[in-house]
A protein has these predicted regions:
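Repeated loop/turn-to-beta-strand initiation elements of outer-membrane beta-barrel proteins
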Residues: 194, 219-221, 248-254, 278-283, ...
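Transmembrane beta-strand segments that form the barrel wall of outer-membrane beta-barrel proteins
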Residues: 219-229, 240, 250-262, 268-270, ...
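Transmembrane beta-strand segments of outer-membrane beta-barrel domains in Gram-negative
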Residues: 275, 282-439
């Protein structure tokens, strides 16, 4: 029997199957794009900083004397810097008549030079001496480690903590960089709180390093409610995460994440990573699964799909310090994606195998009033294959995404301090590709993580960027918590297809501005709210559901 609905459904399904690859670039969700939407940008790493107390010896107290002639200054005890470098710091004192206090000031120049160049406990002194022929002797004491003692009260095995401190050895000159790296790597270990003290050693010129490790909570986590979903799989979402710190006593981390909008979207991920050595090298593995059903305007299609991702990675901190950090990671991802339209029995099943090499880092500087920089760069090389002949043929006749692909991604941000209460935040994210990409690899623009004036996943493409400027003002803290107001401007541009295969518009630009309010309350409650409206003309290919878009996130950590 003839029913008018069937031709309509067939036309809608054909449109859905090809829309993600067309020049319009508007995103009708599938397994690939939804998988990207539910994974927000990774926040900057903020590990617990170790507590370090330094107990210094007081300055040498020598009796005052009358001025005397200084013809030459001799220096001894230095090994980190050559004598000529240190002598240049005090050479202007030669050929003058100086008091002992003035000689101490000359020695302090060398002390400060050592401190500025990573030797926090080194000092130069004018020892008791008999001045003959105007020759004054300045002695450099390059502080060395005496005892290095570890008092482990955490649940991490002693051998792993000992290996992390192994680069620091008795009789070794104390340098700030080496000490910072070892103590920060200790503090990076899940389940560990680090307290360290440097005390004067028993031998002259030595300091003992006493390190105490205490346990941190065995489990941490949080729950969050937001409206960050898209209109096809449900806007309101509830998510949660649970981390088991040091679950097997080897500095390991077991993480569980879930996210759901009800029956239309369900996502779960389990990940485990552990330390391989005392230098912060980590090996990790993860498995995630996703199931979706399209509703709203596309409910009649009975469209649904799944995604499964298996990941393996190896990471290494190359630089670890309070003011600069650099991490490297190599990751392998195997993704299986399934998009089905049951009404027309259309199936698009595919898989990808990809390798990702990435560098991530941060720096703190004193430019203007000071700021924090975060950056990351990654290169992905992969292979896409289809699991059914019909989907493979459709791809070959259109976007031709099957086969080898590669892409570059970059993220840059800076938080500039303007005053005690004001800050300026700048960020840029970009992607470049060598060929047409599957939606799971494309750049998505629109939503709370990019251009907030547009719906989640408004446009997508093989290449593009989005950038943000935010002016943040922190209000006076009250017993109700800390409030922060935000004014922002977002803009993004997408090139839909690297290799154009269909006539029509192949790019889109989205811009918008808005205001926001952030709240950090007691008991680790946080709220983030943004309201934004588009600027300029909205691309015709982008669906519009109103001129104002609002985003809300409510979270509770424990």
């Amino acid at each position: 029997m003839y029913t008018p609905l069937k031709p309509l459904l067939l036309a809608m399904s054909m449109t859905l199957a090809s829309l993600s690859a067309q020049a319009a670039g508007s995103v009708v969700p599938g397994a690939g794009s939804i998988l990207q939407e539910i994974q927000p940008p990774a926040p900057p790493l903020q590990p617990n900083a170790p507590s370090l107390t330094i107990e210094r010896l007081g300055p040498e107290q020598l009796p005052a004397t009358t001025p005397f002639s200084v013809k030459r200054i001799e220096i001894s005890g230095n090994t980190a810097f050559d004598t000529s470098t240190l002598h240049a710091l005090v050479a202007d004192g030669e050929g003058k008549t100086l008091t002992l206090d003035q000689l101490d000031d000359l020695a302090a120049r060398m002390t400060n030079y050592y401190h500025r160049h990573d030797y926090p406990l080194a000092r130069a002194i004018v020892p008791p001496q008999t001045i003959q022929s105007g020759i004054v002797h300045i002695e450099v004491i390059e502080a060395r480690y005496g005892r290095i003692k570890l008092d482990n009260n955490s649940r991490v095995v002693y051998s792993l903590l000992e290996a992390t401190l192994a680069p620091l050895q008795s009789e070794q000159i104390i340098t700030q960089a080496a000490m910072d790296r070892s103590l920060l790597l200790l503090s990076d270990i899940p389940g560990v709180v680090v307290n360290a003290t440097l005390t004067p050693g028993t031998a002259d010129g030595t300091s003992d390093l006493l390190v105490n490790t205490a346990p941190s909570p065995a489990a941490t986590g949080g729950i969050a409610l937001d409206n960050y979903g898209n209109r096809y799989t449900g806007r309101v979402r509830l998510g949660g995460n649970l981390d088991f710190n040091n679950a097997f006593h080897h500095g390991d981390l077991l993480s569980l994440n879930v996210l759901s909008s009800g029956s239309d979207l369900n996502y779960g991920r389990v990940a485990y990573q552990g330390l391989l050595n005392g230098q912060g090298t980590r090996l990790g593995a993860a498995y995630s699964t996703l199931h979706y059903i399209l509703g709203g305007p596309l409910a009649a299609l009975n469209a649904n799909g799944t995604a499964q991702v298996v990941s393996l990675w190896l990471s290494q901190p190359f630089v670890r310090s309070p003011d600069a950090n650099l991490y490297g990671q190599i990751q392998y991802d195997h993704q299986r994606l399934r998009d089905h339209i049951d009404t027309t029995a259309t199936q698009t099943d595919r898989h990808t195998d990809g390798w990702i090499a990435s560098l991530t880092g941060d720096t703190i500087d004193t430019f203007l009033s000071g700021g924090i920089n975060n950056y990351s760069a990654s290169w992905t090389a992969g292979l896409l294959g289809f699991d059914n002949i019909a989907a493979q043929a459709a791809d070959a006749a259109t976007a031709n995404t099957q086969g080898v692909f590669s892409k570059w991604n970059m993220v840059l941000s800076r938080l500039q301090r303007l005053s005690q209460t004001d800050g300026l935040y700048l960020s840029f994210s970009g992607q470049w590709a060598n060929t047409n990409l599957d939606p799971v690899e494309q750049l998505i623009v629109g939503g709370p993580y990019s251009v907030r004036a547009y719906d989640m996943g408004a446009v997508s493409g093989d290449a593009g960027y989005f950038a943000t400027i935010e002016l943040r003002h922190t209000l006076e803290q009250t017993f109700h918590g800390q409030w922060q107001t935000v004014a922002f401007f977002d803009s993004g541009h997408v090139t839909v297809n690297k290799n154009v295969w269909v006539t029509g518009i192949n790019d889109a630009t989205l811009s918008g501005f808005g205001i926001g309010l952030n709240w950090a309350g007691p008991s680790q409650w946080t709220v983030k709210a943004d309201i934004a409206t588009p600027i300029g003309s909205t691309p015709a290919e982008v669906s519009s559901n109103g001129s104002v878009r609002a985003w809300l996130l409510i979270a509770k950590n424990f």
